[in-house]
């Protein structure tokens, strides 16, 4: 999804917390977009990724900028970061880690997905399956429960409404109902991305 489209939903927000991105930029511009937003809001972006190569690349790209942005990178799982930083509060969260395999039964799988599955298994001891993706995102959402400000926005990438089944699926397919229990409402469902908002 185009992450800039989510920004329209915070115009009337009382931003009391920082920004969190679990799953740093892999070419979609998310970290730069949310770091710029953090600067405009006089807040800070915490960008978390388990892959040290991704973290190193993003640090290098941000170091090249002729100006500074309020972003701090963390090379760990989202769950570990949240467990170690329970004192933080977030008003804007992007959940976009643990990639989704759009065609897991294919006889000719995407080489990039296969390479990532091998890397995650060998380096991080993680089985990169769609079930594990939903499981991981739900665990992160549950840990975030007490770390979210009253007014908050959560962006779920690679997640969509499956009309034929009448339910959400993708990375955050299990997260959406949980967030609705917490008072969030879906305000955007577009291009395999979901935006949820909770207002006072």
Name every feature range the model reports, one short phrase each.
Residues 1-200:
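A short alpha-helical cap/connector motif
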